[in-house]
């Protein structure tokens, strides 16, 4: 075996991970080498990258253009049995158990796939705080997957690599599938499986890069809260005075747009922890959606798409130009890039002090939630556990039916402990820091129109500069929320949602409908004392 070192670090032994007769190990290659490797003329199929006119390489991830939660499994053993939030028929989630025996078969499959090959090894960190980060090793035979990992995790220094020992190993065998899946009782021939005793993730059948990123997020979501550290699906930024704000929100609520603010430096756009020192990014890069991307609307992201960025599933024309409007392959077109491709970031390390503002973003398509409400600690836990947003289904003009989504902690797909654990740790951190929480509706109101981005930005500014604290408030019934009656730069007629309806009874009827959905959804958290105690903080129907 030869080890092609692109660092001064000592060579590595992959036999301890189960690999045999590896032809060559390419460890932590430079971006230049990855560019050459992923665009080689002899590559075929999903391995081959195409150079675009922006300088970034574009790849196709095959039939999987998003994560495959139905193919996610975790070994149930002495390590995980007690703390893991296992799926149940009553409250299904993505944490499905498998036995050690099934794991052994899948590990054999993946190690057979990677043995005897030339492999790329990327060593990096998940977590910007050295005390609590996970040292991650990813092994793959596909150059662009190594590139994705280099972009998304925190890149070690030469010195750190010299003594690098992985806490967690990801073996990506995208080219192999499990023909015994029925015998194993699995969902399909594809798999992404975790063993927390062996501290390893195995991937087979899917080429989608996000499985590696979100896999490690799920692991941080397991290990950190058990140490009293908040693990959060949120964006974070910092003001000129060092004040930190965090933004929770599901897809389409404005998390990236509102945290990318010329007046504030970005800490990170997706995954963060909060420990005794403050808020820190888990990642060394960003993974942004590119569907309908334009330079005018999102200049920061557009300008980040250059050499070293990696595009996924976009349409590249013969001349190398990109059609960002084309969603024929998937609406989930993406780009990964190292965080330093964004100009206004917190440097040299993506971390800040304790957050003093926590913002829950919800796009309410029912049109009944206030544009902004200040939350009590109990309401903070309630709305964090609810993780509500709603989309308008249908593309016709006129009336469409709102579809509610409740995703615990604004990221249920990535939770590995019971949701109440995350709420408990977050609120404890907030109380220690004296942080305030706000629920911000970036969706609709009684006018039938979406709340304008100008008004929403005005609301966010009022939260961040503290002027919302000086505003007079009033009580909005049913949702049991306190709302300001005026804010600088915000249309005062929208602040009480009842005022946006010609007939206030129409608001009441819709509000009761949504309140009942909140109540029905929250019932699943009342299986413990913590959840039961929060019911009074949510919507109330007489």
Swiss-Prot record:
Keyword Cytoplasm: yes
Protein name: Phosphoenolpyruvate carboxykinase (ATP)
Location of the protein in the cell: Cytoplasm
Sequence positions that bind ATP: 214, 233, 249-257, 298, 334, 450-451, 456
Signal peptide: none
SUPFAM superfamilies: PEP carboxykinase N-terminal domain, PEP carboxykinase-like
Pathway recorded for this protein: Carbohydrate biosynthesis; gluconeogenesis
Enzyme Commission number(s) of this protein: 4.1.1.49
Primary site of residence: cytoplasm
Organism: Vibrio vulnificus (strain CMCP6)
Record-listed Mn(2+) binding positions: 214, 233, 270
Cofactors (names): Mn(2+)
Keywords from the named record: ATP-binding, Cytoplasm, Decarboxylase, Gluconeogenesis, Lyase, Manganese, Metal-binding, Nucleotide-binding
Gene name of the record: pckA
Family as reported in the entry's similarity comment: Belongs to the phosphoenolpyruvate carboxykinase (ATP) family.
UniProt GO cellular component terms: cytosol
Subunit structure: Monomer.
């Amino acid at each position: 075996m030869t080890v092609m070192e692109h660092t001064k670090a000592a060579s590595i032994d992959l036999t301890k991970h189960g690999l045999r007769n590896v032809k060559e190990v390419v460890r932590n290659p430079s971006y230049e080498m990855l560019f050459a490797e992923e665009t080689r003329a002899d590559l075929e199929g999903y391995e081959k990258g195409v150079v675009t006119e922006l300088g970034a390489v574009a790849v196709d991830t095959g039939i999987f253009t998003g994560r495959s939660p139905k193919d996610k499994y975790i070994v149930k053993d002495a390590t995980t049995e007690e703390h893991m939030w296992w799926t149940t028929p009553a409250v299904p989630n993505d944490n499905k158990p498998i036995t050690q025996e099934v794991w052994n078969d899948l590990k054999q499959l993946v190690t057979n796939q990677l043995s005897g090959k030339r492999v790329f090894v990327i060593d990096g960190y998940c977590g910007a705080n050295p005390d609590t980060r996970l040292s991650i090793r990813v092994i793959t035979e596909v150059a662009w997957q190594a590139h994705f990992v280099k972009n998304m995790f925190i890149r070690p220094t030469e010195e750190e690599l010299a003594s690098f020992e992985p806490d967690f190993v990801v073996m990506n065998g995208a080219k192999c599938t499990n023909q015994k899946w029925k015998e194993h009782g699995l969902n399909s021939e594809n798999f992404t499986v975790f063993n927390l005793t062996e501290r390893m993730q195995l991937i087979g059948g899917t080429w989608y890069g996000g499985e590696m990123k979100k896999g490690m997020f799920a692991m941080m979501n397991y290990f950190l809260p058990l140490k009293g550290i908040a693990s959060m699906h949120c964006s974070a930024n910092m003001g000129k005075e060092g004040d930190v704000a965090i933004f929770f929100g599901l897809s389409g609520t404005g998390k990236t747009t509102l945290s990318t603010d010329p007046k504030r430096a970005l800490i990170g756009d997706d995954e963060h922890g909060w420990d005794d020192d403050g808020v820190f990014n888990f990642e060394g890069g960003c993974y942004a959606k590119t569907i309908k991307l334009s330079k005018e609307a999102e200049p920061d992201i557009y300008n980040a798409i250059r050499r070293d960025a990696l595009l996924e599933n976009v349409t590249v024309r013969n001349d190398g130009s990109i059609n960002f409007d084309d969603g024929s392959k998937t609406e989930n077109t993406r780009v990964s890039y190292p965080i330093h491709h964004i100009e206004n970031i917190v440097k040299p390390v993506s971390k800040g002090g304790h957050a003093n503002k926590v913002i829950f973003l919800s796009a309410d398509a029912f049109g009944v939630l206030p544009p902004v409400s200040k939350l009590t600690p109990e309401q903070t836990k309630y709305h964090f556990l609810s993780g509500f947003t709603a989309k308008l289904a249908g593309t016709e003009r006129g009336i469409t039916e709102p579809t509610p989504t409740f995703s615990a902690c604004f990221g249920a797909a990535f939770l590995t402990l019971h949701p109440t654990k995350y709420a408990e740790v977050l609120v404890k951190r907030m109380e220690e820091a004296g942080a305030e929480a706000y629920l911000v509706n970036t969706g609709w109101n009684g006018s039938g129109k979406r709340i304008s981005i100008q008004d929403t930005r005005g609301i966010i500014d009022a939260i961040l500069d503290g002027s919302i604290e000086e505003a007079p408030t009033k009580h909005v019934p049913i949702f049991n929320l306190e709302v300001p009656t005026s804010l600088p730069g915000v249309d005062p007629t929208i602040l009480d949602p009842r005022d946006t309806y010609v007939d206030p009874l129409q608001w009441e009827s819709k509000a009761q409908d949504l309140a009942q959905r909140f109540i029905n959804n929250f019932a699943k958290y009342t299986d413990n004392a913590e959840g039961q105690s929060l019911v009074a903080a949510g919507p109330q129907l007489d």
